Amino acid sequence: MSTDILRKIEAYKREEIAAAKARLALDELKARTRDQSAPHGFLKALEAKRAAGQFALIAEIKKASPSKGLIRPDFDPPALAKAYEEGGAACLSVLTDTPSFQGAPEFLTAARQACSLPALRKDFLFDPYQVYEARSWGADCILIIMASVDDDLAKELEDTAFALGMDALIEVHDEAEMERALKLSSRLLGVNNRNLRSFEVNLAVSERLAKMAPSDRLLVGESGIFTHEDCLRLEKSGIGTFLIGESLMRQHDVAAATRALLTGAEKL
């Protein structure tokens, strides 16, 4: 996404945040987070898969995208969550942004309740209020996109997540963002293989940036991962955890496609 697109997203997000705060005061929202059961360990679930010698998949529930339009017409978040779990995914990622991705908070809540997998709120975050929202909807992890926030806001979002017992996935797409991300505490780093300005996707981005990450960080390959062979390629660079959405969302049998992607049992 270009800088201009990110600015437009931030503009409508800040309008959404203001409207949400007008509807529900922060203190009341915080009370709702206390009604939730404790977060399931998102990072812990990924590390458990890797420790068992398996690829760790964050499987994404995504109805549409700005670049591809409608991805899955028969969109059923609980059924998709169960299919991903059956196929061997470690965690879920659920789009909650409506204007760009046709996502919704209720998709996250429904998917999270349908299975035992920890869930990420996949959205553009610009205010700690949104972290409390995520927790109140049942999310176990948030996404912090370094391209869209400054260092102070990134730390504020991360601190809020940690205070709520959540994990934070820090997303980067170039060396400068990786350097900034490494100043944060989270061990969960996502490398987006999509150039946010040209939309070009290249797995070499993950391969290049992986060299910058200390061994205590868990790297997640994002975008452009379609086959088991793609997973094997990134594993050579030390990346065995992946966030994958579109390629699985387009499959008729999501559970079988997930299993094939992770194990190479059959071609997708």
From Swiss-Prot:
Its EC number(s): 4.1.1.48
Keywords associated with the record: Amino-acid biosynthesis, Aromatic amino acid biosynthesis, Decarboxylase, Lyase, Tryptophan biosynthesis
GO molecular function, a single term: phosphoribosylanthranilate isomerase activity
Reaction it catalyzes: 1-(2-carboxyphenylamino)-1-deoxy-D-ribulose 5-phosphate + H(+) = (1S,2R)-1-C-(indol-3-yl)glycerol 3-phosphate + CO2 + H2O
TM annotation in the entry: none
HAMAP family named among the record's database cross-references: IGPS_B
Family note: Belongs to the TrpC family.
Stated name of the protein: Indole-3-glycerol phosphate synthase
Species annotation: Brucella ovis (strain ATCC 25840 / 63/290 / NCTC 10512)
